[in-house]
């Protein structure tokens, strides 16, 4: 497992050929505009657990996008694997470990969430303190 993480990180570093300052994981339907962007589909990444099966979550582009924001190199993970899709927790966490081995200074994770609080509007920033695991 660890060797696959290292090999995947090395593949991404070689593919984009620039240091990566920050990484962002986008949730369903969320986009991010980058300057000078390049893309790499998950299916093209050797050893990536998600390249064997199509991700079934609507709104996930299933690709890495590399580019710049305010002069900083940013890697965007457009979609991720989910435990409820039948992936193991190791598979779900795989790209987070890869990002760590890319040497980024920070990782920002977004998601689409539902709430019962009627004061929330689309696009609000919320802090999750609990969730429902529908896969028990």
Model-derived features: positions:
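N-terminal cationic-hydrophobic initiation segments that often serve targeting/anchoring roles
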Residues: 13-16, 100, 117
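Phosphate/pyrophosphate-binding betaalpha-module
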Residues: 113-136
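C-terminal binding/interaction regions
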Residues: 92-93
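N-terminal short beta-loop-beta anion/metal-coordinating cradle
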Residues: 1-88, 133
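Non-catalytic positions within long, well-ordered alpha-helices that form the structural scaffold/packing
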Residues: 99-103, 108
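Hydrophobic/aromatic beta-strand patches that form the interior of the parallel beta-sheet core
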Residues: 75-77, 108, 126
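Proline- and acidic/polar-enriched loop/turn elements at helix boundaries
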Residues: 79, 111-112
């Amino acid at each position: 497992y660890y060797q696959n993480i290292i090999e995947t990180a090395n593949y991404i570093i070689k593919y984009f050929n620039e240091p990566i300052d920050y990484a962002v994981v986008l949730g369903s339907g969320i986009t991010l505009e980058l300057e000078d962007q390049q893309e790499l589909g998950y299916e093209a990444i050797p050893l990536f657990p998600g390249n064997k099966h199509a991700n079934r979550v609507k709104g996930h582009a299933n690709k890495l996008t590399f580019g710049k924001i305010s002069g900083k190199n940013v890697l965007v993970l457009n979609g991720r694997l989910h435990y409820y899709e039948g992936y193991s927790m190791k598979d779900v966490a795989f790209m987070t470990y890869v990002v760590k081995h890319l040497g980024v200074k920070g990782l920002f994770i977004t998601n689409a969430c539902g709430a019962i609080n009627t004061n929330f509007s689309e696009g609000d920033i919320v802090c999750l303190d609990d969730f429902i695991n529908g896969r028990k």
